[in-house]
Curated annotation (Swiss-Prot):
<feature type="binding site">
    <location>
        <position position="171"/>
    </location>
    <ligand>
        <name>phosphoenolpyruvate</name>
    </ligand>
</feature>
<feature type="active site" description="Proton acceptor">
    <location>
        <position position="315"/>
    </location>
</feature>
<dbReference type="InterPro" id="IPR023193">
    <property type="entry name" value="EPSP_synthase_CS"/>
</dbReference>
<feature type="binding site">
    <location>
        <position position="342"/>
    </location>
    <ligand>
        <name>3-phosphoshikimate</name>
    </ligand>
</feature>
<dbReference type="GO" id="GO:0005737">
    <property type="term" value="C:cytoplasm"/>
</dbReference>
<keyword id="KW-0963">Cytoplasm</keyword>
<feature type="binding site">
    <location>
        <position position="388"/>
    </location>
    <ligand>
        <name>phosphoenolpyruvate</name>
    </ligand>
</feature>
<feature type="binding site">
    <location>
        <position position="95"/>
    </location>
    <ligand>
        <name>phosphoenolpyruvate</name>
    </ligand>
</feature>
<protein>
    <recommendedName>
        <fullName>3-phosphoshikimate 1-carboxyvinyltransferase</fullName>
        <ecNumber>2.5.1.19</ecNumber>
    </recommendedName>
</protein>
<dbReference type="GO" id="GO:0009423">
    <property type="term" value="P:chorismate biosynthetic process"/>
</dbReference>
<dbReference type="InterPro" id="IPR013792">
    <property type="entry name" value="RNA3'P_cycl/enolpyr_Trfase_a/b"/>
</dbReference>
<comment type="function">
    <text>Catalyzes the transfer of the enolpyruvyl moiety of phosphoenolpyruvate (PEP) to the 5-hydroxyl of shikimate-3-phosphate (S3P) to produce enolpyruvyl shikimate-3-phosphate and inorganic phosphate.</text>
</comment>
<feature type="binding site">
    <location>
        <position position="169"/>
    </location>
    <ligand>
        <name>3-phosphoshikimate</name>
    </ligand>
</feature>
<dbReference type="InterPro" id="IPR006264">
    <property type="entry name" value="EPSP_synthase"/>
</dbReference>
<comment type="similarity">
    <text>Belongs to the EPSP synthase family.</text>
</comment>
<dbReference type="GO" id="GO:0009073">
    <property type="term" value="P:aromatic amino acid family biosynthetic process"/>
</dbReference>
<dbReference type="Pfam" id="PF00275">
    <property type="entry name" value="EPSP_synthase"/>
</dbReference>
């Protein structure tokens, strides 16, 4: 088996990075553009495999989408403009694509089968199946956890519902809201903890109306959306890898440009500042929620991460775990059981990989207890098909002074950050 040999024993990282477009916003720009009336143009779209799965799904549903002058142009025909697909919709590795598009297709008068790759086929869809069934959709997956493939028969006469989310999940909230845009009457979604709000913000950007009152979102349907010009900011979840690398590799100084700082996503910035990070925000644009972040090597100390903070940094927890292995003292992550049903069981996989490199991490039911600082050594590792695990391992390898780090299935990183290794080489000034 051919494994990728990762760069180890890096000197200080220096330079400027423009991280790729935000994955969450890219998905939603395509989804809403596909059912808005008129021509939507998207600048700065992430061209990772997950977003390409969303684009391909809408092409299969009859929407014209093409690239022109570095923009994605979507010819939306409104909610009535989608056609029954001639083939199965393949969502690849993308849970966002499957869950949000299932919500959108809930109000369509045709049936569709949605499949995914091996990893997506192990991710539970019961969380969207139950609320969508309550709205009048025929939808089912495999076993009682409703694993993909999903079979869905839409319903033009969707019923509005009031639904309290049993878990903190922006994807489930979004699926219900996308269905609610096509239901006659008032739908309310009540969150357990506030999760990323890109769907709510972008529905409004496309001319939709909803009311957010704390953890309660109210939407009266049906509604029509109007095409927009969207500029996608850099993805804070991708920036997080460089942020942590800059903090833990001695002598480093990095400038991360044009990073999206929607407050529902900035948990990582609060955590690293609490741990002692020296970071400076430059060119902050509060209206557009974009900033550049200058980060320098810092002496970090352990902390506790729990509660309402977790949904605001759920995707950053693997790289935060690496940071904690280099911080003084104990870091405790709890209330993060959602990590167990991501692309991999991220609690177990992060623990196993970093411990194999010499870290001191104890996995718990809903998180990790990490003692630092520890020296990291070479090991044979795998992404297990999970992009964020791969990037975490590549950053960890930079700290290794003894031994080699080999990574299997590195192609998973293409999901969200196709130029990751190119950017890494640029920052390693040997």
């Amino acid at each position: 088996m051919k494994r990728m040999k990762l760069r180890t024993n890096a000197g200080p990282l220096q330079g400027t990075i423009q991280v790729p477009g935000d994955k969450s916003i890219s998905h939603r720009a395509v989804i809403l553009g596909a059912v808005a009336k008129g021509e939507t143009r998207v600048k700065g779209l992430l061209k990772g495999e997950d977003v390409l799965s969303t684009i391909q799904a809408f092409r299969n549903l009859g929407v014209r989408i093409e690239e022109k002058d570095d923009q994605l142009v979507i010819e939306g025909q409104g909610f009535q403009g989608l056609n029954a697909p001639c083939q199965t919709l393949n969502m690849g590795n993308s849970g966002t694509s499957m869950r949000l598009i299932a919500g959108l297709l809930a109000g369509q008068p045709f049936s569709v089968k949605m499949i995914g790759d091996e990893s997506l086929s192990k991710r539970p869809m019961d969380r969207i199946v139950y609320p969508l069934k309550q709205m009048g959709v025929e939808i089912s997956g495999e076993t009682d956890r409703q694993f993909p493939p999903l079979q869905l028969q839409g319903n033009r006469n969707l019923q509005p519902i009031t639904y309290t989310l049993p878990i903190s999940s922006a994807q489930v909230k979004s699926a219900i809201l996308l269905a609610a845009l096509q239901a006659k009457g008032t739908t309310q979604v009540v969150e357990k903890e506030i999760t990323r709000n890109h769907t709510e913000e972008m529905i409004q950007q496309f001319g939709g109306r909803l009311i957010v009152d704390g953890k309660r979102i109210t939407l009266v349907g049906p509604q029509q959306l109007t095409a927009q010009e969207i500029t996608v900011p850099g993805d804070i979840s991708s920036a997080a890898f460089w942020l942590v690398a800059g903090l833990i590799i001695p002598g480093s100084e990095l400038l991360l440009k044009n990073v999206g700082v929607n407050p529902t996503r900035t948990g990582i910035l609060e955590v690293v500042e609490k741990m002692g990070a020296q970071i400076v925000y430059e060119d902050m644009n509060k209206k557009e929620q974009v900033t550049s972040i200058r980060v320098v090597y810092s002496n970090m100390k352990g902390t506790i991460i729990s509660g309402g903070l977790i949904p605001r940094l759920i995707d950053e927890l693997p790289i935060i775990a690496l940071l904690a292995t280099q911080a003084q003292g104990t870091t405790c992550i709890k209330d993060a059981q959602e990590l167990r049903v991501k692309e991999t069981d991220r609690i177990q996989v992060v623990t196993d990989i970093l411990n194999s490199m010499g870290a001191n991490i104890k996995a718990t039911a809903d998180g990790m207890i990490i003692k630092g600082p520890t020296v990291l050594y070479g090991a044979n590792t795998s992404t297990y098909g999970d992009h964020r695990i791969g990037m975490m391992t590549a950053i960890a390898a930079l700290l290794v002074k003894q031994g080699q780090v080999h990574l299997d299935k590195e192609e998973a990183i293409m999901t969200s950050y196709p130029t990751f290794f190119k950017d890494l080489e640029r920052l390693c000034h040997d």
